[in-house]
Amino acid sequence: MANLRVLKKEIDYRLEEVVFDCDMAICFQPSKEKEIFEVMQEAVAVRNDLFAKAMNPAEPHNPSLVRKHYAALRAEMDDVFGKLFEKLSKINEKK
């Protein structure tokens, strides 16, 4: 983990990927626009939650705990955005 700026850019990048995939899904399956839009809204809420956690570590004056906090945040980010991609895939599989 290099620094907070890199982490925030990574969170934004993941959000952009989800939103782009949702836009493409809407283009190909306009009948599922409402379900896909809900995934987009959930992704934005996740981004805001992750930013709030990134900006407010539990113990900001203890470098060891800050590193652990950011490592846990990165793992949570991978997990949550992975679940959003899976949710979008399930929506796209339905006919």
Predicted regions and their residues:
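Low-complexity intrinsically disordered segments
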Residues: E38-Q41, A45, D49-K95
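Long amphipathic alpha-helical segments with strong coiled-coil/leucine-zipper propensity
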Residues: M1-R5, I91-E93
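Surface-exposed, polar/charged faces of alpha-helical domains
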Residues: C27, S31-K34, E38, A45
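N-terminal acidic leader/helix
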Residues: L4-P30
